[in-house]
Amino acid sequence: MDVLHAHDLYDEQLIDRVGDAVNEDAGDDLDTLVDGQQQQQRVGFNRQMDILLDAPQEPPLGVFPAQGGPNGPPRLRKKRSFYTMTKPTPPCQSQEPEMCLLMASVTRAMRHVREDQRGEYFANYLVENMTSQNYPNGVGLPQHWGQL
């Protein structure tokens, strides 16, 4: 086997020398060296193309930055939940809550009182003003719990 291999190597050298003689070359293999340098330069210029041609048939990662690439590892998309999605509120919910006339007048009057006296003022105002004289037949008083 070794003899056969050595014989093939000798034949290749002989063919190279014959090629030099045919081309009227000096036999210094300068043309082979130049061809090798040109081949190396071609490989350097087309390295990216060679990588792409040798790659499996998949798109490069740079095309889809979400899959990874220069910005870092891929990010998982947040899965939306029906309960956490914000929805536009109807205009009736964005307004102030329903309030009876008595409560509206109490809050208006309490704006002029200091904060430490507001609780006492609130109770006194209701006792003084929640009378049948001010609200005949209960008109303007709270009709159900939570309205006051």
UniProtKB/Swiss-Prot annotation:
Glycosylated where? N129
Pfam families linked = SOTI (PF17079)
Tell me the superkingdom of the source: Eukaryota
> What are the BP-aspect GO terms?
sperm individualization
For whether the record's keyword set contains Amino-acid biosynthesis, the answer is: no
Which keywords does this chain's UniProt record carry? Developmental protein, Differentiation, Glycoprotein, Spermatogenesis
- State the protein's purpose: Post-meiotically transcribed gene that has a role in late spermiogenesis; required for actin cone progression during spermatid individualization.
Q: What family name appears in the similarity comment?
A: Belongs to the male-specific scotti family.
What name does UniProt use for this protein? Male-specific protein scotti
Query: Lineage in the entry?
Result: Eukaryota, Metazoa, Ecdysozoa, Arthropoda, Hexapoda
